[in-house]
């Protein structure tokens, strides 16, 4: 029977065959105690291409502190941000809606490939938020 209380990240960290994985995680600065905790992915659409997303770096830094204080291991990732403000009224607008799928795919790949236990996502606008909602 599957242990419902077992963290998904144990797929990456438990057992002799996962020694290389643990070594890789140690190279990121994690110690054995951290490796035993739940891994929480933090993904945002920070970028300097729009004023809407420029605060996301600070927000994610604060989220990181909260996750650590709560007993999790925060692991940051990022997704693209396409600004309608500067992409509209020219060929760039063709990429706005497409960016939603790209965002959704990249966030899913980041979380599933690394077997993270949880995801906290912050975005600045409808395109990015809807991308993850997809």
Tell what function each PLM region has.
Residues 1-120:
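Metallocofactor- and cofactor-centric catalytic cores in central/energy metabolism, strongly enriched
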Residues 121-125:
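Conserved small/polar residues in nucleotide/adenosyl-binding loops
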């Amino acid at each position: 029977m599957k242990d419902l209380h077992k963290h998904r990240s144990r797929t990456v960290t438990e057992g002799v065959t996962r020694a290389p994985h643990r070594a890789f995680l140690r190279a990121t600065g994690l110690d054995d105690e951290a490796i035993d905790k739940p891994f929480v992915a933090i993904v945002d659409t920070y970028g300097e291409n729009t004023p809407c997303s420029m605060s996301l770096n600070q927000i994610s830094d604060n989220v990181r502190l909260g996750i650590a204080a709560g007993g999790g291991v925060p692991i940051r990732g990022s997704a693209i941000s396409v600004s309608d403000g500067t992409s509209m009224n020219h060929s760039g607008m063709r990429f706005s809606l497409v960016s939603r799928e790209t965002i959704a795919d990249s966030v899913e790949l980041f979380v599933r490939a690394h077997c993270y236990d949880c995801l906290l996502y912050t975005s600045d606008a409808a395109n990015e938020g809807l991308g993850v909602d997809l």
